[in-house]
UniProtKB/Swiss-Prot annotation:
Residue stretches making up the GATase cobBQ-type domain: 249-441
Bilayer-spanning residue ranges: none
Pathway participation: Cofactor biosynthesis; adenosylcobalamin biosynthesis; cob(II)yrinate a,c-diamide from sirohydrochlorin (anaerobic route): step 10/10
Cofactor entry: Mg(2+)
Organism of origin: Halalkalibacterium halodurans (strain ATCC BAA-125 / DSM 18197 / FERM 7344 / JCM 9153 / C-125) (Bacillus halodurans)
Secreted among keywords: no
GO molecular function: ATP binding; cobyrinic acid a,c-diamide synthase activity
Catalytic machinery residues: C332 (nucleophile)
EC numbers on record: 6.3.5.11
Record-given protein name: Cobyrinate a,c-diamide synthase
UniProt key word DNA repair: no
């Protein structure tokens, strides 16, 4: 059994995250082991999920990876959990195109045969709420909208009126409601959000959400709905292959400045024979001297520019190690970190690692957002020329090269295409967050490159510690 629910919304901003976190917190308080998932490529909401459930949340994205792999990511993630709660993205039917459900929350709910709770903002309406729900039921009659959550109620009586209308016209119950002002607003998705989550600064918010949801939601009926979901079977052997004994160590920067990683990337690397060794530049920790590879993920280096600049001064071996051939993948924030300088939106410029001949300028507006089809322009330790992988891009900065650029990828998105990133024989870096499950061979290729580096290092007498 894999008890599960999808929390969907009529539109962005309707309260999906509030309801999701409230349910997670309430079920955790009841003693349940709760697993979080997020539809789409977003990293921020999974950070919330992790803060509440104490389990790594996983992304379910039917554009970046195949439907079979989405199915298996879900099965892999919910292992050991009593209940899985899947937070939707945008409106229920919003996906890759305006005429298709592909990539939408509805798409994921059908793929996983999961019952759906639809969050509806009932502000300023009564019976009309039933018309809204009816439309969502009828647009694709294959989906299973099993109940609704009413948000923005003016009073308990207002929620009752809408509930009665929906039950009569749509045949499904309202299983909970939130009145205006019931709970504090979820903090904006600003740069300091994840560090604040890691410090536990929002724990009181989660407790308030749990209290309100426990009082105003029918948790027993919601749990019964989740238990009605039929068991899923694995469709691939992607996460079932015999794990190779660890043969190399890959250092992974992991702290408030570097924390945007897809969990499947870690899973596939371990399966291929890598031991992941985590270190935190923000805590002043050294790059592990015994590592055979380096993974610098995304995050918010601009938020910690001074601290990272000082770490680079105190740890010059990072530049030396990367330039000496350490197989290194740097994505988005990690890419920025390896540049020569970073200039904040306030005009302050700090020195960065100086590995890549570029300067990074932070902007006050979004520079790039969207899915990417990625094709490497040449052979590297991770990808062969022409080998394809998929990923996602989201950043507020621009990279300006100070020498001739050596772009890593040709990337194609919905609204354009072009070259991006930087590469050498042992370094692959760019703004795109790569999803290894879209091309699983990359994990094996990286581990093989690390083995070559390790053997060369040992031959030079640098014995592994």
């Amino acid at each position: 059994m894999q008890p599960r629910l999808v929390i969907a919304g009529t539109h962005s901003g309707v309260g999906k995250t509030t309801v999701t976190l409230g349910l997670m917190a309430a079920f955790v308080e009841k003693g349940n082991i709760v697993q979080g998932f997020k539809c789409g490529p977003d990293y921020i909401d999974p950070s919330y999920h992790r803060a509440v459930t104490k389990r790594a949340s996983r992304n379910l994205d039917s554009w970046m990876v195949s439907e079979d792999v989405v199915n298996d990511i879900f099965i892999e993630g919910c292992n050991g959990a009593d209940l899985s709660i899947i937070e939707g993205v945008m409106g229920f039917y919003d996906g890759k195109a305006s005429t298709s459900d592909k990539g939408s929350t509805a798409d994921i709910s059908l793929l996983l045969q999961a019952p759906v709770l639809l969050v509806v903002d009932i502000s300023g309406m009564a019976r009309s709420a039933a018309a809204v729900v009816k439309g969502f039921q009828q647009l694709n009659e294959k989906v299973k909208i099993a109940g609704v959550i009413l948000n923005g109620a003016g009073s308990e009586r207002h929620a009752e009126m809408c509930s009665e209308a929906i039950k009569e016209a749509c045949g499904i119950p309202a299983l909970g409601y939130l009145k205006k002002g019931d709970v504090p607003s979820i903090p904006e998705r600003h740069l300091g959000l994840v560090p604040a989550l890691e410090r536990g600064e929002h724990d009181s918010l989660f407790s308030q959400l749990a209290a309100v949801v426990s009082r105003q939601f029918d948790l027993e009926r919601i749990e019964r709905l989740a238990l009605e979901a039929s068991a899923l079977s694995r469709r691939t052997n992607l996460f079932q292959q015999t794990k190779r004994p660890s043969v190399v160590k890959i250092a992974v920067a992991y702290d408030a400045a570097f924390h945007f990683y897809y969990e499947e990337n870690f899973t596939l690397l371990r399966q291929a024979g890598a031991e992941l060794v985590y270190f935190s530049p923000l805590r002043g920790e050294d790059l592990p001297s015994h590592c055979d590879g380096l993974y610098l993920g995304g995050g918010f280096p601009e938020e910690f520019a001074d601290e990272l600049s000082q770490w680079i001064k105190d740890h010059p071996q990072l530049k030396k190690r990367v330039q000496s051939g350490l197989p290194t993948l740097a994505e988005c924030g990690g890419y920025m970190f390896l540049g020569e300088q970073l200039t904040t939106t306030k005009g302050k410029t700090v020195e960065m690692a100086g590995v890549i001949p570029m300067v990074v300028q932070m902007e006050n507006k979004l520079v790039s957002l969207g899915y990417r089809d990625v094709t490497p322009l040449d052979d590297s330790f991770l990808l062969s020329k022409g080998q394809q992988i998929r990923g996602h891009e989201f950043h507020y900065s621009k990279a300006v090269y100070t020498e001739t650029e050596r772009p890593a990828y040709f990337v194609k998105g919905l609204f354009g295409e072009g070259k991006e990133g930087y590469m050498s024989d042992h370094l692959l870096a760019g703004y795109t967050h790569l999803h290894f499950a879209s091309e699983p061979a990359v994990a094996t290729q990286w581990v093989k490159a690390c083995e070559v580096y390790k053997n060369r290092r040992l031959h030079r007498g640098q014995v592994s510690q």
